[in-house]
């Protein structure tokens, strides 16, 4: 309707267009008094431009791995529609799109309104590696070999058991342990313990092939298998955990662990992931949580929300506060696993899909979980947390806001530590801002008896905190690690991995790629900075030497030739 009503004076208005339709608009008015006529006129000008759909697409620039995300507003015929769109902080902070003077606060922060038919924004890609490299002189070889041997000598019968010795047969805890074994296997192989690495890979093959088969000895199984449910368009793994059946919750977490373990198998035995072996089953798991728009079996990007740029955990989302998401690191693991699998199998489409999901997960972690602009006092409108929020971070994002909590504990070590599990080179996004990380670690350890991981009580993830601390101050993490003679690893972590992680970060320094300042043209390439000295790490999944370039802005700062099937560190 062309009628305009002031809601403060109300009044009666008729619908006077031929369609007998009207558009109701909540105007973004933040101050007391009447809404300005200029605001009313601007919104009225687009009020009858009917938007039937918003198409969200991504593209990866292979020259610098920058990801561009485009929101397009279309009518029922698919033609572009001029409208006034609300741009969330992730959008307007990373776009060149001009906005109107009108804005409003939301659960995510300031929404700015813009006249447009589409907008695009750019986010940096963080990068992944199959494991951290083993660099001569960065650790004691005998110590690391001993920790790998200790893990192997436990026996494979305990690799997928709880601390009490109970065997796991659900998708979450089994997947978590498969990821752990994949990490130890990769470390073992990197230091020449090939026999031990192969033993772990053989165990992973047996475990995953068991899950990927519905029968045992000609009889249908009741545990450790997947089935497709056509009513709900989903793949269900038996046994379920944490509502993965009843609520279709956390599929990206659970199945991402399986894909991560499978990707390590593919890295060392590509034939096992062939289309005539287990490749189709691995890709079916990926499709369940990261399907294309036109997938006939699964919803588009089940857990990932392209509009917000991050993932939601729950499938039912019938909470009063809407949906929620806790661990960005488990989401990043799921999406990073797609990248590793895509690189190992030379599947560019999957690799770039994983890069988009992984980059967006990292960008939104810093935008919404850590409110990095608020932390840096950029401006009032850039501060996404509501006035009076007492912390520099949050653990749970809800539809209506944030919550400094976890689902299982009120301990600060858990509330902040959950963003550091599982610890692997798929979660580098958590360590991007080393200065911020100092305050993050201090807050997470503020309830420790000595403000260090060694002072945490049992089951508060000492090892994960050493790993997080190493991303900002590796020498301090190592010193505290060396003060502890015995500890129980977090369920998805191993002593070999922790030792390797903290000493490798001590050698390499802080992450230097991932914020957009330094970029590279390879998905498995990372730059580090230690006291102003750069190190460049590349893993080449192919059988050919490949050139890799690192840039600062448009200036090339390093080029290297990455050797086939392995790490190159310069």
Feature names for model-found ranges:
Residues 1-252, 292-310, 314-315, 342-345, ...:
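Ser/Thr/Asn(+Pro)-rich, low-complexity disordered segments
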Residues 168-189, 204, 245-274, 278-282, ...:
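Aromatic-rich carbohydrate-recognition surfaces in CAZymes
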Residues 258, 285, 350, 354-357:
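Alpha-helical solenoid repeat scaffolds, predominantly canonical TPR units
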Residues 271-274, 347-351:
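Acidic, serine/threonine/proline-rich low-complexity intrinsically disordered regions
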Residues 273-283, 287-303, 340:
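Alpha-helical scaffolds that organize eukaryotic protein assemblies
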